[in-house]
């Protein structure tokens, strides 16, 4: 009896070991086990007839029942030699566990991969939920093991495709570094009044910049008393600077101008007299670098290097250098430079046609402090009187005389004092504040001399009118 039990025990041990080995050697993708309904471990009971006797009674094992059914059970579980040969060609229908993995060349061990590989379902088909499908995301095929941070970013992308973790949308336009420069740098000019002549001059300046294919916009500063509606209609950008003009008009009691002095100054007058000071105030946080151009200038060649040159930008650090400008170059009919200080015929000012600066709060505060008057004593009144006698250029020289640098204006910018042939001029910028081709008597005279430089200005104005009509 003992020998029989030992042989049965050995058979059980060998059979169980063989069963475990077979279950672990089976392929993961067994089509016979995809729709099991009964046993959680995948042994379908409806494919086998019930045993005639109970194999387990309580916690004791019924050895006689096991002995009687051992032969049949072995055939059922493992089959005969012929059955085993057939089983090599088709999948076994019995697996103890189904959570082993076939690790191929593309090994993936992230959390989402393991969950997708596991077959988790409830025993009852009515309670099984439909399989969860991953959203279709256009990604390249996996050839390497994904890291956990990549999985986190992928999940965040699914939750919020527009978040910072999902990258830029393919539908959104891409910006190049040049686009940022175009927005942070600009040409600036100032409209002093609403006269037809002033509007014509600004329009010709804007058209000349377009003709030379400048990559930067022209902005026109003006007060609310100046009507710049016509400029906006033709696509020129404008900016009202009343807030900064009022800063100079209304410093308050004990600081700034007295009430009697304020009444003598209008916004238009301050806009004309101190207009260049507003460059330091009105463009802070709007542009990083600006180039002021006189409103009566005509640009004949591309001058974008004034805004793009690293030498120019690096020179202005708002400490040792606050601004760059040109030195005024007056030329006569013989193309000879005229020194305005030594000219006996007429006194020419030294207002530059080009001013390059970086709007900065510290520089603006320096100008504001310069205008601040503490107390109403004689010294304060003298300072008030001095301010009303100074123009913007004089104030800038008093403040930044030792921090003012100049660009080489030889062959760059000229102010002709007489009509000269256009083909003899080799300058990028021509200033027409003396020739004034917009005045009737001057453009009539220019019509009689087609080679005159004034016809460059008049031709551009006529082209604009033809396009507008």
UniProtKB/Swiss-Prot annotation:
Q: Name one GO biological process term.
A: meiotic cell cycle
The PTM Phosphoserine maps to 23, 27, 39, 122, 130, 136, 147-148
Keyword field contains Acetylation: yes
Q: Which InterPro entries match?
A: GNT1/Glycosyltrans_8, Nucleotide-diphossugar_trans
Supply the Gene3D superfamilies for this chain: Spore Coat Polysaccharide Biosynthesis Protein SpsA, Chain A
Q: Quote one Gene Ontology molecular function term.
A: protein-folding chaperone binding
Positions of region (Disordered): 22-55, 67-92, 117-143
Function statement: Seems to act indirectly to modify IME2 activity, thus permitting IME2 to carry out later meiotic functions.
What does the miscellaneous comment read?
Present with 1850 molecules/cell in log phase SD medium.
UniProt-recorded name of the protein: IME2-dependent-signaling protein
Q: Which source organism does the UniProt entry give?
A: Saccharomyces cerevisiae (strain ATCC 204508 / S288c)
Q: Which gene encodes it?
A: IDS2
